[in-house]
Amino acid sequence: MNIILLGPPGAGKGTQAGILVKDRGMVQLSTGDMLRAARTSGTEMGNLVAGVMDRGELVTDEIVIGLIREQLEAGGSGFIFDGFPRTLAQADALADLLAEVGQTLDHVIAMEVNDEALVGRIVNRAKEAAAAGQPVRADDNEESLKIRLMEYYKKTSPLLGYYHAKEQLRWVPGLGAIDDVAKGIADVLDA
């Protein structure tokens, strides 16, 4: 089973992906994690990624699709796409890739959380990390969140209509206890 978790920054996508990995043995494909791992891998793709990043350039969709292809071909018991796709062009590229490797996209789960709650979550996440002596993400502040939300609404939210038209979109309330959100996602996956 392959799924995409969609939602604005701070919606809890990473938290819920972690639960799915633990409970269902799925593989989380986080583009950020894949790029960092590729950079240090010493592979041909890794050297390409390192060169692009070292020059301060944006990693192209083609490179990201190549990394995802490697993961899909390595196999697994279902994939969670986290941080990809972010645009309609990327959604089309992912659909083409899945078709090429003989896989399907089973569900796109959109996590609903209002902006006010997102601000509270992000501020709280930063406070909890600082209190625990852990590093605070540089973008875990209200000003950065506003910029990230603008980007999300501009570029990523059109994916909601795209996947709705394909009858793959499922809404799950993202507010509430982590376990309640996880149950909502499980209900979608088990339906």
UniProtKB/Swiss-Prot annotation:
Residues holding AMP: T31, R36, E57, L58, V59, G83, F84, P85, R86, Q90, R137, R148
Localization per record: Cytoplasm
Tagged with keyword Kinase: yes
Binding-site residues, ATP: G10, A11, G12, K13, G14, T15, R125, G176
Catalyzed chemical reaction(s): AMP + ATP = 2 ADP
Transferase keyword on record: yes
Region listing for LID, in residue ranges: 124-140
Protein origin, superkingdom: Bacteria
GO cellular component: cytoplasm
InterPro entries, A to Z: Adenyl_kin_sub (IPR006259), Adenylat/UMP-CMP_kin (IPR000850), Adenylat_kinase_CS (IPR033690), P-loop_NTPase (IPR027417)
Main localization of the protein described in the UniProt heading: cytoplasm
Protein keywords: ATP-binding, Cytoplasm, Kinase, Nucleotide biosynthesis, Nucleotide-binding, Transferase
HAMAP family: Adenylate_kinase_Adk (MF_00235)
Name of the protein this chain belongs to: Adenylate kinase
Species annotation: Jannaschia sp. (strain CCS1)
Lineage: Bacteria, Pseudomonadati, Pseudomonadota, Alphaproteobacteria, Rhodobacterales
